[in-house]
Amino acid sequence: HDHSHHDHGDHSGYGTGRERIEVLEDIFAENDHCAAHNRDAFDAHNVQAINVMSSPGSGKTTVLQHVLAAAQAAGIRTGVIEGDIETSLDADRLGGYGAQISLLNTGNGFGGECHLDAPMVAVALSRLDLSALDLVFIENVGNLVCPAEFEVGEHRKLMVYAVTEGEDKPLKYPVMF
């Protein structure tokens, strides 16, 4: 390449005329640090944690009812961190399966978030007796966009998908899939 370019304009393709700003700080750094502490707490008590995610109404709570019943029958000690924007309806549904339940209403003191993040899960963990548990399910707020991007300290992610949601969802929400 032996010639110079005199056009130093924005060639980003956005055509906004606005200046592009380079972000030098990981916006998830604080969350990820807290997620690592949550994972350390689970690991210190030999507890496996599963982050359960899906769209609203796709069946997370129903799946958990069946899993908790089977776990109780098998003698597996379970806990649930139940994330919901406003109500305790799902937490109430899960209350009869021998699991410790810690409810997080994201609309109550957490700004109405559409997902759980690691600091919220840390609050919920403080309400559980991890020494009395083998397995914790983190039922995230129903949403296909935000929950997939936030680590909360889980060992595994589980996505519940209802076929009635349409075959285009993996294309529209690739981070979740």
Residue ranges and their predicted role:
Residues 14-40, 44-53, 58, 62, ...:
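Nucleotide-state-sensitive switch-loop elements of NTP-binding domains
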Residues 143-156, 160-177:
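Conserved C-terminal guanine-recognition region of P-loop GTPase G domains, centered on the G4
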Residues 1-15:
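Long, basic/Gly/Ser/Thr-rich N-terminal segments
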